[in-house]
Amino acid sequence: MIIGLFPELEPAGGIQRVGRHLAAVITEFAESRKMECRLLSLNDSPELHRMSVGDREFVFTGSARAKGRFTATALRSARRHAKLVIAAHPYLAPVAQGMRIAAPRMKSIVVAHGIEIWEPLSTLRRRALRRSNVILTPTQDTANHVATQQQIPRDRIRVLPWALDPDFENLAVATAQSSLPLNYPAGRVILTVGRWQSNERYKGMDTLITALPRLLHEWPDLQLVAVGDGDDRDWLEQMAKSSGVQGHVHFYTGLTSVELAACYSACEIFALPSRGEGFGLVYLEAMARGKPVIGGAHGGAPEVIDDGKTGYLVQHGDVPQLATSIETLLSDPALEREMGARGRERVNREYKFGVFAKSLKKILRELCES
């Protein structure tokens, strides 16, 4: 048996999307070896769920945030001759290690995403992480933090870049005006996508708003479109009003996948000048649509964005540098197209779901056969 442990799988979000990718590949791998597969989610509602990633279906059971129920189900599953457990977040590492009491020969993988391991974990979580056979990370930057902050031997850390979602990839090219959300602005558009939470201001949405007055002097039809919601939206809207650019900042929430794809297609530049991205799946989505991307010169973003070739990297909070990067692109449409084309080529070469699935299956095979 192979067991997968997940924080949650149904909601939107980068960690959730990676979880779905993992679940789909784990299921496919188990089926190919005629092994039983059990996928458990801590936060999702307590019934059997069915989801898919592209044409790969998987089922999982939720626990409605009941940690006791989740842990008990995991322990019972481990007793059924489990060979491998994959914990899709470091916070679930203690559950995975507890399962090894019931199945001492079972191997374990823990997935680290980024900012959650940039500081030392609690003693319990760090000890469980150290006892794992393999720690998967999406970038070398995250791998370095796992090694230094959590004191994990480097030979147990494997870098596995995340992938473009095949459902996004398979969408029909959504460029028609009718596919855009209602009241989408006319003009040249900078797009940003994220969660606008007060505890996640590292995303850099505020610096985009601060840069707008300078940019509007040269391009008065410029618009900033922000897809996502959060408790910081009121603060950001007030910032736009105080800066006199409220008519150029537009928030959209609850978009369909087709509407989101249309937003990527309709924008001229994608920007998320964050200092806390462990990877940045939204960069892949923009690159797949042939758009130049601007990200923070921090975390895992420099491993996704080729500075000066597929976009630009800027220091978090450096508004003049951010504005200059945007100006360079807006003033040179040929450069925009060139960078966008390079980004699309890189996604097609390195970040397709098939590449991710093949690499993950190789790791699963090694552990199952060792």
Predicted feature residues:
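Short hydrophobic beta-strand element within catalytic cores of glycosyltransferases
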Residues: 292-295, 305
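Aromatic "clamp/platform" in nucleotide-sugar-dependent glycosyltransferases that forms part
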Residues: 275
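Short alpha-helical donor nucleotide-sugar binding micro-motif in glycosyltransferases
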Residues: 129, 254-255, 262-267
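A short, well-ordered alpha-helix in the C-terminal region of glycosyltransferases
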Residues: 321, 328, 335-349, 356-359
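Carbohydrate-associated surface elements
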Residues: 141, 163
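Nucleotide-activated donor-binding/catalytic signature segment of Leloir-type glycosyltransferases, i.e.
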Residues: 234-255
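Conserved donor-binding/catalytic core segment of Leloir-type glycosyltransferases
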Residues: 183-203, 209-212
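Conserved acidic donor-binding segment of nucleotide-sugar-dependent glycosyltransferases
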Residues: 307-308, 312-319, 328-333
